[in-house]
Amino acid sequence: MSEFDGPIEEFPLVSVDRFDKENLNSTVYLLSHCHADHMVGLDALAFAERLKYKSLKLYCHRVSVALLKSLPLYNHLYPYLVPLDTDTPVTINVANEDGSVCYLMELTLIASGHCPGSVMFLLTSLNSSVLFTGDFRFDVGQAGRLKALQNFSKDAQLQIDNVYVDTTFCKESAEVIPKREDCLEVIFDAVKRWIEPAKDRKNVLFVNKTRYGYEFLMKALAEKFNCKIHVSDQQYSLYKYLPSIQQFMTLEADSTKIHFCKFKPGADNNLQIPCQHSLGFYPDVLKIIPTAMFFTKAESSPNSLVKAVIEKTIRCCYSTHSSTHEVVDLLSSINFKKLTPFVRPDRETSIDSVRSLLFEKLKAYKPELVQTENNKPSENIKEGLWSKPLSFKRTGRGCKRRLSSEKEAKEVEKLQNDEFNKDKNLNAEVERSLETEVERSPVDLSMAL
């Protein structure tokens, strides 16, 4: 569960994944993905009015735009959404409250592997750089191959000032979580053993509480067993602007043996499956709970990927968040100055202890890395090329520049003049194409996941 407050310290007037309280003073908003803990305040009237009356924008991946457009709670935000693609840097004018340009920011989206549309944000300016991971799941070695982070790789000269990192499973008991591919094989085997006798009454129900996020699993099941996956009406309508996802789903309960449909509030407790009345018979149902949290607890067996709960109900290991080792692998592949975890793996663990754990693990990769009281690198770490001071100072609800030299001031002024019209044209073009892009262009699911 994300505990991030929203403002990016190094980039004044920019807020990520939080849209209430002090974030209503920002002028640039970023959404990493459409899970509730990253959308606090997004449905509030105050935020909608902020966007409308100040002509502000919310930037996110185009898959997230399609999802927000399909949700009644958020579709009123559609005119203010700017759809972006991964690995395509865009320049954004970060404005003061009065609309004047405060500074220029380059934004790059990086696919994060958590769910459809989920991305990391790489923010850079003349003097600052930040990586906000959002929720992510990377394999070991994957981070080192990311084009967007090459300038900050361990062999490069530049450093990221702050890494805001997903630490959902950063604890000793979650040092390693099996790859999704390995977990899929276990799930495939469980499903096959249950439905292969080809008895009509045999059905499998996957139990999960999230609105979305298991599309990769559903797609894999559909391809493996050459069938569509039954979902509820509400789930199906969520993907009406994403045909590449909707194509492996069905509303016909009796046309498949694999179900992701959900029980409605107040449903009959005697039902074995939400769609039981539509099946026309009393089904024999195996319930599968895809989960990682259970398998990271001390009492679970580290060598088991499946665990029986009660009769005809099993838990299967499946994670959409990175393990401790995978998080450390990401951090070890880049140069950074400061580390800001934004998730506590459990109630007993503090953010400070999570940070300490990661620094301890990182010493194996970077012996020179020393955690100081201020979470800054030790003196023997080389400074990045962007280490020259160019600070921002808030004045009322805006900010002003303090430039380290007259030459730098002129350089910034020239950049602002050159880029301002370019950025205005970019935003206008994005807005004009938004209506047709989401509806006409099927989303490549492999890219989004």
Q: What residue ranges belong to the model's regions?
A:
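Cap/insert and terminal regions of metallo-dependent hydrolase folds
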Residues: 140-239, 299-376, 381
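Conserved G/P- and acidic residue-centered "switch" motifs that form tight phosphate/ATP-binding loops
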Residues: 33
